[in-house]
Amino acid sequence: MELLFLGTGAGIPAKARNVTSVALKLLEERRSVWLFDCGEATQHQILHTTIKPRKIEKIFITHMHGDHVYGLPGLLGSRSFQGGEDELTVYGPKGIKAFIETSLAVTKTHLTYPLAIQEIEEGIVFEDDQFIVTAVSVIHGVEAFGYRVQEKDVPGSLKADVLKEMNIPPGPVYQKIKKGETVTLEDGRIINGNDFLEPPKKGRSVVFSGDTRVSDKLKELARDCDVLVHEATFAKEDRKLAYDYYHSTTEQAAVTAKEARAKQLILTHISARYQGDASLELQKEAVDVFPNSVAAYDFLEVNVPRG
């Protein structure tokens, strides 16, 4: 599980920062990539990475402002030209379906793969045997969501050496033991599968704030997460601007991370007014409150290790 920041700017593209998009690379877990937001020219940014558009399985949109969605039509269309055949699902607020379908219709774009579009509400928006994705409403003046990606605990590996020492040869019985079932062997012995499994590996979690003012719902969503990706459009001295425009400051993001007991904070969605050394100062403002903070930049990659 890795994060790759494709765009870390706010509002409009800048020379050093494209508008918002973050890739969650799940290549080991499910051989796919999930995107969170898809600002203008996200597909251009992808060209500078190892991401293959056909591997993009899901796109989660936090809200319908242009700097978070204008890259969708181009990316969806290009995916067809780049070998995309597997279904892609887009999740987002009301309006996302009309935006995508209208864009594809008026440009007469034909997709070579199934496209599903889900307009979401608060709650669980996706779940399978590996992951659960939860959305909560955040405060941005329009309908907007934050997302938590929670990996489910991974069952412990089978203690095959112990089984062999007990003269239990490999075979279908190993699958039952691996599921934790109680098994009766051919010689009459009864064993509990859980006794032959290593401890389960705790699932990892990543939270994406989207654009928001300080939000109690977001803080709860981020409780004990491994990584909190939080917008920091403004420096702490610009607190009033942040409030007026429904955004957060570096300091506010850091306080949220601290109160949520997140393990790591990554700042993104940084205004173009902060260039060069000024953007380094943003990171320092967060570190002063929450030491394990970093200000993202375009193409930053962050591994999400198991605890």
From Swiss-Prot:
Cofactor comment text: Binds 2 Zn(2+) ions.
Binding site for Zn(2+) 1: H63, H65, H140, D211
Top EC class for this record: hydrolase
Catalytic residues identified in the record: D67 (proton acceptor)
Positions contributing to Zn(2+) 2 binding: D67, H68, D211, H269
SUPFAM superfamilies cross-referenced by the UniProt entry: Metallo-hydrolase/oxidoreductase
Assigned keywords, A-Z: Endonuclease, Hydrolase, Metal-binding, Nuclease, tRNA processing, Zinc
EC annotation from Swiss-Prot or TrEMBL: 3.1.26.11
InterPro entries per the UniProt record, alphabetical: Metallo-B-lactamas, RibonucZ/Hydroxyglut_hydro, RNase_Z/BN
Cofactor(s), by name: Zn(2+)
Gene3D superfamilies assigned to the protein according to its UniProt record, in alphabetical order: Ribonuclease Z/Hydroxyacylglutathione hydrolase-like (3.60.15.10)
Family matches, as Pfam families: Lactamase_B_2
Family: Belongs to the RNase Z family.
Listed name of the protein: Ribonuclease Z
Species of the source: Bacillus subtilis (strain 168)
UniProt gene name: rnz
